UniProtKB/Swiss-Prot annotation:
Function per UniProt: Core subunit of the mitochondrial membrane respiratory chain NADH dehydrogenase (Complex I) which catalyzes electron transfer from NADH through the respiratory chain, using ubiquinone as an electron acceptor. Part of the enzyme membrane arm which is embedded in the lipid bilayer and involved in proton translocation.
Species whose genome carries this gene: Petaurus breviceps
Protein name: NADH-ubiquinone oxidoreductase chain 4L
One cellular-component annotation, GO: mitochondrial inner membrane
Predominant location category: mitochondrion
Reaction(s) catalysed by this chain's protein: a ubiquinone + NADH + 5 H(+)(in) = a ubiquinol + NAD(+) + 4 H(+)(out)
TM region(s), chain numbering: 1-21, 28-48, 59-79
Record's keyword terms, sorted: Electron transport, Membrane, Mitochondrion, Mitochondrion inner membrane, NAD, Respiratory chain, Translocase, Transmembrane, Transmembrane helix, Transport, Ubiquinone
Oligomer status and interactors: Core subunit of respiratory chain NADH dehydrogenase (Complex I) which is composed of 45 different subunits.
Enzyme class, broadest EC rank: translocase
GO MF term list: NADH dehydrogenase (ubiquinone) activity
Annotated family: Belongs to the complex I subunit 4L family.
Upper taxonomic lineage: Eukaryota, Metazoa, Chordata, Craniata, Vertebrata
EC code: 7.1.1.2
Amino acid sequence: MMPISLSLTMAFSLALAGTLIYRSHLMSTLLCLEGMMLSLFILMAMLISHFHMFSMSMAPLILLVFSACEAGIGLALLVKISANYGNDYVQNLNLLKC
C-alpha cells in the first residue's frame, strides 16, 4: 500500500477510534466525524485519480457536500442542546422526551 494511502487509512482509523472513545461530549464526536469525512474525501480523490476513473470524478465533491451538510446540522444541534441543557454531554440527553 502506498505510504500516503496508508497514512490516510490510519487517519480514518484514529478518527473512528476517537469517535468511539470520546463520545461523552458532542463537540468531540463532531470533530472526529469531520476527520473521518476529510480522510475519506482525500482517499477517494486519490484513488479516482490513480485508477483513472474519470466517470466517478464527482463522487468526492458529493461526499464533501454531504460532509458540509452534516457539519451544519451537527453545529446547529450542538448550539440548541447547549442552549437548552447548558452543556454538551451526550449521556445527559434523553432523546425519548418531548
